[in-house]
């Protein structure tokens, strides 16, 4: 967000207006709603960009509609499980569906590891972990009807001791382990798994683990696993100038390579700017929030992960990046090669469609 803000204001702002930036920290749903109301009613901001957790998204969606406040989410959705609780929002623009990386992970499991017959899962015991596991099982079963799921483990979010879980996995001896770990628990799990050689023969699919990519050091993170980076991978191509510019800016500023949240922030603000400018080109005046909201689903803008936009039911459309881990790179952490780029049309259910109905509609 800061890089976008600096660049935008340095090049004239939005229609000649300098962008003013207010920042609040996301906490509990209740407290975040209070901050959302403050930004809207006291600070009178034009748009609110952000939102990470599903619980916060479920709380913010109705408030945004009540206040008529444009809310352009990063990660947060208004899904309960895999079902959309607010299918026809006007001012709330949600992130991608929570289960997209699990869909992609299952597709790549079938592609790269077609001989897998038994699968275990270790996922955090909350909605995202359970949704990803259920989705992965449904999609993999579509491609591999004889696969058996032999173990499912549910450590609490924030768990740091996985020795008992790893022992259970070794005992079950599956062909592949699936996980939707997405934060520091990914790194901790790999360190502890390396100590007992868990992946010497076992395959793995960590559909969201790339969110902490620069902590996944080669010394304990195996090559040959499926690793997902959500909707941004810092080396997805050498031919997208915006990517090179942003990665260089981010690395200079933070001395690390950007995670996927950086692109959520960049895109949501870039989309807002483009919508304002499109409205202005039509009406010749600064548009209302209602007018901007009506245009957001009609635009596609270049972001650092490629072109991104919104579906007709206000969900983000973008690429997702997964691939096979490799140690053949100049870094001290793993990267992926090949890089599989999957767009929303491939791994996100269409507008007004239920997830499992969509999966059942696929051809064999």
Question: Where do the protein language model's features map onto the residues?
Answer:
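Stable alpha-helical elements in mature extracytoplasmic
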Residues: 1-4, 32-36, 44, 48, ...
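Signal peptide-proximal N-terminal region
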Residues: 2-21, 141-147
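Short, charged, surface-exposed loops that flank catalytic or proteolytic processing sites
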Residues: 15, 277-294
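Residues that mark the start of a beta-strand
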Residues: 20, 117-118, 175-176
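Short, well-structured alpha-helical segments in soluble
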Residues: 22, 26-46, 109-112, 160-173, ...
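Extracytoplasmic ligand/sensor domains, especially the bilobed periplasmic-binding protein
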Residues: 45-154, 203-227
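Hydrophobic alpha-helical
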Residues: 54-65, 161, 167, 174-196, ...
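Extracellular/periplasmic periplasmic-binding protein-like sensory domains
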Residues: 193-267, 277-283, 325, 335-363
């Amino acid at each position: 967000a800061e890089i976008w803000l600096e660049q935008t204001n340095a090049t004239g702002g939005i229609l000649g207006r300098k962008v003013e930036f207010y920042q609040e920290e996301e906490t509990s749903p209740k407290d975040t709603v209070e901050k959302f109301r403050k930004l809207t009613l006291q600070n009178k901001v034009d748009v609110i960009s952000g939102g990470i957790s599903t619980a916060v998204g479920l709380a913010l969606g109705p408030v945004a509609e009540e206040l008529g406040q444009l809310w352009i989410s990063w990660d947060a959705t208004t899904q309960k499980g895999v079902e959309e609780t607010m299918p026809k929002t006007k001012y709330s623009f949600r992130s991608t569906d929570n289960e997209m990386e699990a869909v992609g992970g299952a597709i790549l499991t079938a592609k790269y590891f077609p001989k897998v017959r038994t699968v275990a899962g270790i996922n955090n015991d909350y909605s995202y972990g359970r949704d990803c596991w259920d989705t992965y099982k449904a999609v993999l079963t579509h491609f591999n009807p004889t696969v058996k799921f032999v173990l499912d483990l549910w450590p609490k979010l924030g768990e740091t001791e996985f020795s008992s879980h790893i022992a259970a996995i070794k005992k079950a001896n599956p062909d592949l382990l699936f996980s939707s770990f997405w934060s520091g628990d990914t790194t901790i799990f790999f360190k502890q798994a390396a100590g007992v050689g868990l992946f010497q023969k076992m395959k793995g699919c960590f559909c969201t683990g790339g969110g902490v990519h620069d902590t996944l050091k080669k010394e304990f993170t195996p090559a040959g696993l499926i690793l997902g980076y959500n909707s941004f991978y810092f080396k997805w191509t050498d031919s997208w100038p915006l990517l090179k510019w942003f990665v260089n800016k981010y690395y200079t500023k933070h001395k690390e390579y950007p995670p996927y949240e950086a692109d959520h922030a960049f895109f949501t603000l870039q989309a807002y700017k483009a919508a304002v400018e499109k409205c202005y080109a039509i009406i010749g005046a600064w548009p209302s929030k209602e007018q901007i909201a009506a245009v957001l689903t009609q635009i596609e803008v270049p972001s650092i992960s490629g072109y991104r936009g919104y579906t007709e039911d206000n969900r983000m459309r973008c690429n997702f990046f997964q691939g096979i881990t490799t140690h053949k790179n100049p870094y001290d952490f793993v990267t992926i090669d090949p890089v599989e780029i999957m767009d929303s049309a491939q791994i996100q259910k269409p507008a007004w469609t239920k997830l499992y109905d969509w999966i059942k509609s696929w051809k064999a």
